């Protein structure tokens, strides 16, 4: 049986919101329109708009209301544009935004490592017993001049411990990793109720300045190869064994 893939970010978000335990980790995410953009900016001040379907951080745009409400700006790729009014901001966004379904998501103030933003990828797979297991957690450090952390968009793969060492001690890191593993498994269980043929997921998790984790989105075709960069080679080897068991056609070298 083929592994189930779910393209729509919003569809997956709606499933997570049905869980009382998980909804507190999901930032507000709604369909992008002129009206929702304005109301979300008024409420949160900083947002990300992104395609409902897509990978590698392509098409993600950061939108902000400037301090004292003196204007707006957005960043797409490495380009930053500033506007004096909401109308001109929206016009500018429509000129650069691909004409397909977009979402608007509450912006999270990410933790930084050497002045660069980072987030985490939590890999979750069905193990050899058919149970969900968090098999790896790795950090992704953003390119200095970009807003996304994806490796394919210039991000740097970095161990969790390296990124978090200046924010918490070793004992706190161990507890935090366990918390992320639990969130990963809970997310997989919740999604598999609606999508029973899922076998693997990758959670993109932001950590805010209060150290709260946020599930930015869930990828149902996660890239395991980034974990080959970890010094503990057993992590990737376990991922490969699990993938071979639930999908012999899923070649993970």
In which residue ranges do the predicted regions lie?
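C-terminal active-site "lid" helix and adjoining low-complexity regulatory extension at the edge
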Residues: 1-10, 14-15, 168-171, 175-178, ...
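A conserved helix-loop-beta module that forms one wall/lid of the active-site cleft
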Residues: 1-59
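Phosphate-binding site of ATP-dependent enzymes
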Residues: 44, 77-155
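A long amphipathic alpha-helix within ATP-dependent nucleotide-binding catalytic cores
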Residues: 96-108, 144-206
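Protein kinase-like catalytic core scaffold
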Residues: 47, 133, 214-216
């Amino acid at each position: 049986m083929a592994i189930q893939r779910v393209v729509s970010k919003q569809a997956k978000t709606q499933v997570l919101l049905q869980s009382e335990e998980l909804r507190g980790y999901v930032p507000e995410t709604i369909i992008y329109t002129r009206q929702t953009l304005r109301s979300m900016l008024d409420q949160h001040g900083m947002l990300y708009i992104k395609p409902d379907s897509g990978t590698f951080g392509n098409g993600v745009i950061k939108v902000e209301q400037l301090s004292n409400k003196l204007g707006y700006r957005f960043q797409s790729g490495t380009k930053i544009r500033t506007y004096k009014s909401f109308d001109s901001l929206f016009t500018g966004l429509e000129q650069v935004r691909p004409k397909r379904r977009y979402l608007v998501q509450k912006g999270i103030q990410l933790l930084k490592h050497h002045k660069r933003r980072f987030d985490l990828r939590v890999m979750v797979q069905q193990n050899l017993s058919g149970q969900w297991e968090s098999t790896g957690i790795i950090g992704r450090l953003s390119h200095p001049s970009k807003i996304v952390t994806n490796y394919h968009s210039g991000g740097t793969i970095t161990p969790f411990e390296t990124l978090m060492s200046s924010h918490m001690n070793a004992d706190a890191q161990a507890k935090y990793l366990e918390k992320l593993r639990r969130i990963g498994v809970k997310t997989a269980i919740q999604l598999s109720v609606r999508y029973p043929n899922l076998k693997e997921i990758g959670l993109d998790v932001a950590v805010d300045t209060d150290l709260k984790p946020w599930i930015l989105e869930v990828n149902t075709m996660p890239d395991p190869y980034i974990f080959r960069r970890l010094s503990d080679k057993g992590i990737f080897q376990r991922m490969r064994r699990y993938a071979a068991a639930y999908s012999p056609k899923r070649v993970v070298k």
